[in-house]
Design a protein with these regions (language model features):
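Feature captures the catalytic ectodomains and active-site-proximal regions of enzymes
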Residues: 1-212
Length: 212
């Protein structure tokens, strides 16, 4: 087995990371408040849409499923699924599910450890189903610190511009975003994206304040 580092997309979040790992010619962040990413004009939101994109790109020889569904299959069913597809994407969501919620975000490291155990079980099941090549990827990373977040952890500036479409603690999507000393602005072309949605990311590892 080999472990290789790779640079992810910016901004580093689920929708863009998952879309970038699909076959694509053009990635566009949707011009609305959803943060959804379009792959060659199609929404990549959800496993069903991602499976459709995979199937179209491979003449029906690729699909997507989730960890829980595959692990619930018996050996014959899992073998048939692999036999019907040259490529199979299997999504595992424990880390995101834990880390994205305020009441459980402190358990992110524990979730990462449990995920490693899940992946070992998954690899064994895939090997028993005659899978020949297995690649494990991550669609984005996360910032974790084992202490309470302090005032100094937040950026002292707030994103502003003609239109703020989507806010996250680590980035903002919008149009006509105004330059700021505490934020780094990227045009879509600088990030390998199409469309006209711009991105701002706090400098260093500072967070942005969210209302509510």
């Amino acid at each position: 087995a080999e472990l290789e580092p790779a640079l992810s997309m910016l901004p580093s979040y689920t929708q863009l990371g998952m879309a970038a790992l699909l076959p694509n010619k053009e990635l566009v962040i949707a011009d609305n408040d959803s943060g959804t990413v379009l792959v060659d004009g199609q929404s990549s939101q959800g496993t069903i849409n991602r499976s459709k994109i995979l199937s179209q790109a491979t003449g029906g020889r690729a699909a997507a499923t989730i960890y829980e569904d595959l692990m619930a299959m018996n050996r014959d069913d899992s073998r048939e699924l692999l036999k019907a597809n040259d490529v199979l994407y299997i999504y595992h969501n424990r880390i995101d599910h834990t880390g994205d919620k305020m009441h459980s975000e402190g358990q992110a490291f524990e979730a990462a450890e449990q995920t490693m155990e899940d992946l070992v079980r998954l690899i064994k099941k895939l090997a028993a189903a005659n899978a020949s090549n297995i690649l494990i990827t991550a669609d984005h990373g996360f910032i974790y610190q084992n202490r309470a977040i302090e005032e100094s952890d937040f950026s002292g500036v707030e994103a502003a511009g003609e239109s703020i479409l989507y806010r996250d603690r680590r980035f903002v999507l919008g149009k006509g975003l105004k330059a700021s000393q505490g934020l780094r602005k990227f045009l879509p072309t600088e990030l390998g994206l199409h469309g006209d949605v711009e991105v701002q990311i706090p400098k260093s590892i500072n967070r942005l304040r969210l209302k509510g």
